[in-house]
Swiss-Prot record:
Binding site for NAD(+): 130, 192, 215
The record's free-text note on cofactor binding: Binds 1 zinc ion per subunit.
Binding, substrate: 238, 260, 263, 329, 362, 416, 421
Gene that specifies this protein: hisD
Protein name: Histidinol dehydrogenase
GO molecular function, one term: histidinol dehydrogenase activity
Binding site for Zn(2+): 260, 263, 362, 421
Superkingdom as given in the UniProt entry: Bacteria
Catalytic reaction list: L-histidinol + 2 NAD(+) + H2O = L-histidine + 2 NADH + 3 H(+)
PROSITE patterns: HISOL_DEHYDROGENASE (PS00611)
GO CC terms in record: cytosol
Length: 431
């Protein structure tokens, strides 16, 4: 049952509890398991991958069958409908168009005495994309991770994903990968896949950046290999916070709440509204839509533990509460959403108006759906082209510029006791 909370102190406490739902305290057992997997893959390479795949996925592989071959890639196109292929291609087009606008440009500026300063952006050489298996196939995850890497100019893009029954990979995932330009695909998942990407094996060369969502073990593995490789984020369960006025449609709000809850038993679905009548209507609509929901058990668990409706005095108070929660997805289902946007400080993505369900951002609109969760929107942003880029500073001094500023450099170097730093300038200033 979706709860309605009317007391502000209780509402704040519940929002904090939900935000902290993935703070599992001691995870020593899981961390130890992941550490052992990482060490084993780093040491034994393909043999470890094959043994872990047999242990966890109950699939028997060989070094020759780790990589998805061309005939399986070709066959995938015969197994998807024209409607799905068209949808994948439209999504690719719009995601690519959006991310091309976000590519930063290298620059230089010319200062006094011939000083040249600048910044040069370059892509990483290789990126590894993790695509979950398990409850569902996620071609959208492929597109959202691969396309920014392509736009950034990454030369080698690798995808890893757990194998299904018969060693197969979902054809929709394979088609999305090919549409996004990926041909190097491996049927391996879990922490062992992250280890392979980070350390390399006989079959899977290492990469520079790893992106993509996964379960707790994948997240812990990404956390532990960070530093050896870059990562996008430590993503937790999905979440939506909806701010709605009395004119919002209850059934539509209910569908948006359930759209998050159906992801995961830990998913959060929150509505903040000043309208008690809307709140009650949403509860009714949620119950009606759950009645024949194909993922009813999973979705009900999320709604029961991490779903709520909070009654607020004003929409402005709702925004203040949202900022403290820093949701992954924020929907402003109000008559004038632009009047609230400037007050929003912390949100992964903001969806404006009654006709903008979060699902359009998940699949098609263009902005990335890989977003910060569990309050991380306070300091983090969506995955994007920048995830696959790095920048180098450019500095050039002329003799005149060094004569003018060298004294200050030497003073600072002497203050820090770094005599060779001082002398590297002094020797250049000698006649």
């Amino acid at each position: 049952m979706l709860r309605i909370i009317t007391q502000l102190t209780d509402l704040r406490a519940e929002l904090r509890r939900i935000c902290d739902r993935t703070d599992s305290g001691e995870m020593s057992e899981q961390q130890a398991t992941v550490e052992a997997i990482l060490r084993r893959v780093a040491k034994d390479g393909d043999r470890a991958l094959i043994e872990y795949t047999a242990q966890f996925d109950h699939i028997d592989l060989t070094p020759e069958t780790l990589r998805v071959k061309g005939d399986e890639l070709d066959a995938a196109y015969q197994q998807v409908s024209k409607e799905l292929l068209d949808a994948i291609r439209l999504a690719k087009q719009q995601i690519e168009a959006f991310h091309r606008q976000r590519v930063p440009k290298s620059w230089v500026q010319f200062g006094e005495d011939g000083v040249v300063l600048g910044k040069r952006y370059t892509a990483v050489d290789a990126a590894g994309l993790y695509v979950p298996g398990g409850r569902a196939a996620y071609p959208s995850t492929v597109l959202m991770n691969a396309i920014p890497a392509q736009v950034a100019g990454v030369q080698r893009i690798v995808m890893v994903t757990p194998p299904g029954q018969g060693k197969g990979i979902n054809p929709a995932v394979l088609v999305a990968a090919q549409e996004a330009g990926i041909q190097e695909i491996y049927r391996v998942g879990g922490a062992q896949a992250i280890a392979a990407l980070a350390y390399g094996t006989e079959t899977i060369p290492r990469v520079d950046v790893i992106t993509g969502p996964g379960n707790l073990y994948v997240m812990l593995a990404k956390k532990q290999v960070y530093g050896r490789v870059g990562i996008d984020s430590l993503a937790g369960p999905s979440e939506v916070l909806i701010i709605a006025d009395e004119a919002a449609h209850p059934a539509q709000i209910a569908a948006d709440l359930l759209a998050q809850a159906e992801h995961d038993p830990l998913a959060a679905a929150i509505l903040l509204t000043p309208s008690l009548s809307l709140a009650k209507a949403v509860v009714t609509a949620v119950n009606e839509q759950l009645a024949d929901h194909p993922r009813r058990v999973l979705t009900e668990k999320a709604i029961a533990h991490y779903g709520l409706i909070g009654i607020v005095e004003t929409l402005e108070q709702a925004v203040e509460l949202s900022n403290s929660f820093a949701p992954e997805h924020l929907e402003l289902e109000v008559e004038d959403p632009w009047s609230l946007v400037e007050q929003v400080r912390h949100a992964g993505a903001i969806f404006l108006g009654y006709s903008t369900p979060e699902a359009v951002g998940d699949y098609l609109a263009g902005p990335n759906h890989t977003l910060p969760t569990s309050g991380a929107a306070r300091y983090a942003s969506a995955l994007g082209v920048e995830t696959f880029l790095k920048h180098s500073s450019i500095i050039q001094y002329t003799p005149a510029a060094l004569r003018k500023q060298g004294g200050a450099v030497m003073t600072l170097a002497e203050t820090e006791g770094l005599i060779s730093h001082r002398d590297s300038v002094r020797l250049r200033l000698q006649p």
